Amino acid sequence: IDVSLVGSEMCIRDRVGTSGISEEHLSELTKLFTNSNCIVVPNFSISAILLMHLSEIATPYFSTIEIIEFHHNNKIDAPSGTALATAEKISQNMTENLHDPTTDLALEGARGAKAQGNIPIHSVRMEGMLAHQEVIFGSTGQTLTIRQDSSDRSSFMPGVLMAIKGVPNLTGVDVGLETLMDV
């Protein structure tokens, strides 16, 4: 926020790349950027944004949904901000919360953490991975898996460039790369 304070006073266009930004910080940024522009981007991966969008579209057609996110072993938060954002977007297209039929857990947490809409999120932290997420949808006799993989940090650069080029066309504070995409 301190860097953005200087930027807003100088009418500098700002790009903030962070996951898990609080509503309080967003509110502060909104107050700061009244005469200039700022975009807060929790995830610069275009494929992750498209995964969330496609998941929203698929949601009404399936009765069960689970999210599995995989990240490198140095990521300290779980679940990822992208997994939580995906669950939030999915839950907005649900007519009712999901029901988990599991009644006997041999190991606590085996069904994942429950996010909005009672959507299970499973987090994997492992060497050899960077950032991956899949959303699995199921209904009678069929499943659909939507998966996104970032195997190299260079995969975030097209999103960074999109934010740099797009922020002059925004007003105030916008959140998410999707505000610059036609989704």
At which residue positions do the language-model features occur?
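Single conserved hydrophobic/aromatic residue that forms the stacking wall/gate
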Residues: 1-7, 11-12
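Rossmann-like NAD(P)H-binding beta-loop-alpha module
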Residues: 50-62, 78
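Short, ordered loop/turn segments at secondary-structure junctions
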Residues: 19-21, 43-45, 70-73
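Proline-centered loop/turn at the N-terminus of a beta-strand
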Residues: 13, 36-39, 66
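Glycine/charged-rich beta-loop-alpha catalytic/anionic-binding loops adjacent to active sites
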Residues: 31-40, 139-146
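C-terminal substrate-binding/catalytic lobe of Rossmann-fold NAD(P)-dependent oxidoreductases
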Residues: 63-68, 72-183
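Rossmann-fold NAD(P)-binding glycine/threonine-rich loop
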Residues: 17-38, 53-57
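Short acidic/glycine-rich loop or secondary-structure boundary segments that cap or lie
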Residues: 24-25, 48-50, 75-79
